A protein has these predicted regions:
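An active-site-proximal "capping" alpha-helix that borders the catalytic cofactor pocket
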Residues: 54-74
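A short acidic, often aromatic-flanked loop/helix-cap motif at beta-alpha or helix-coil junctions
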Residues: 198-203
Length: 215
């Protein structure tokens, strides 16, 4: 397993676990909001230096939508040695907001797939097990992966084996790189939402927050 040692991810991707078969039918029929265990995975690489305020705002908005039974953790990353678990699983919004507000930009080549794998491993091993609970990871990035040692096929296999869907909010002040994030989302049943300005960020976050809590 890749050791957590890094920064904050700039495309928000949410990994979402399917509910058990018997409960799935109930949830999908009713559209009921279910409790979720999820991780914020945030790119803190230098290419996002001018976007840090927007990234912090996006992550904070995701946290603010948490219900009383939702738990979350925060991972930031740049390259593989800088994948850092900034906040362990917690139900407390205040602890999550502190982790988000303390994010900072670092130099290095971005390793999206390695960060996703690390976060998925942590989620699957540490999420609370108490009946019908969804699992998710929120990835924030521009989608450019320059340094991962993990293969995308292997990462997708882990996500599918753990019934985790991926939702992405992609942002950049120059260019979005869709290849990796599109595949992660589409092959796990998630979506990619692109945020081009601060004005549309709230809508993107609301779309992800709603979908990660329902079937």
């Amino acid at each position: 397993m890749i050791r957590f040692v890094a920064a904050f991810l700039i495309s928000i991707v949410v990994f979402y676990a399917h509910v058990p078969a018997q409960d799935k039918a109930v949830a999908s029929k009713s559209g009921e909001k279910l409790p979720v265990s999820y991780g914020l995975v945030v790119d803190n690489s230098g290419s996002f230096r001018t976007l840090l305020d927007r990234v912090v705002s996006a992550a904070a908005d995701v946290v603010e939508d948490n219900g009383a039974e939702d738990e979350a953790f925060v991972v930031t990353f740049v390259d593989t040695p800088k994948i850092v678990l900034r906040q362990e699983f917690t139900f407390k919004k205040s602890e999550l907001h502190d982790a988000v507000q303390n994010m900072f930009i670092e130099g290095g080549q971005t390793a999206i797939l390695d960060a996703v794998k690390s976060a998925a491993d942590y989620l699957s091993q540490n999420a609370r097990s108490d009946g019908v609970r969804l699992h998710a990871l929120v990835l924030v990035t521009d989608g450019e992966d320059r340094a991962s040692v993990s293969k995308i096929e292997d990462v997708i296999k882990i996500l599918k084996e753990n019934n985790i869907r991926v939702f992405v909010v992609a942002m950049s002040d120059t260019k979005i790189f869709p290849k990796v994030i599109d595949r992660l989302a589409k092959e796990t049943g998630g979506i990619v939402v692109v945020s081009k300005t601060r004005a549309d960020l709230g809508t993107a976050v609301k779309q992800i927050s709603a979908q990660m809590r329902t079937r």
